[in-house]
């Protein structure tokens, strides 16, 4: 847990509506995990000398945020995190972030389902993919390598 989550965890409880939004979001994240491992497990195993048998997880830095947590982390007042519609996906570098984004675009195209936001964001210390899916009125907003202070 981060310092922010420890300080604010008590009030960071999603409602039933938020949980439904999180379930919708996790379907996409599970498809991302499966496709990531299908496409890149062999490459990773070759780099590790063929000793690879465990699939890589998708690591989520942030999903639902209460208004208090969102404010504490400097989130936008209209953030999709406030409704449980967004997740920030940890990336090991720009290459992984771009590959995650490509997979999510492919999933959207193949399923003919839209997402709201697909953003690659970075700060001085890290890079992540911000991905959001709303129940309706998804905008398919794509933006790569946005700088976030912090």
Each language-model region and where it sits:
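Catalytic cores and adjacent binding grooves of peptidoglycan-active enzymes
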Residues: 78, 83, 91-150
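Short secondary-structure junction motifs
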Residues: 55-57, 115
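A generic structural signal for short beta-strands and their flanking turns/coil linkers
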Residues: 56, 83-85
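Charged, often glycine-rich, active-site loop that binds/positions anionic groups
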Residues: 50, 68-83
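A structural signal for the main folded, soluble domain(s) of proteins
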Residues: 57-61, 74-77
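The substrate-binding groove and active-site-proximal loops of carbohydrate-active enzymes
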Residues: 16-19, 86, 90
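Acidic helix-start/capping segments at beta-turn-to-alpha-helix junctions
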Residues: 59-69
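Active-site acidic/histidine clusters and adjacent loop/turn architecture
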Residues: 1-45, 49-55
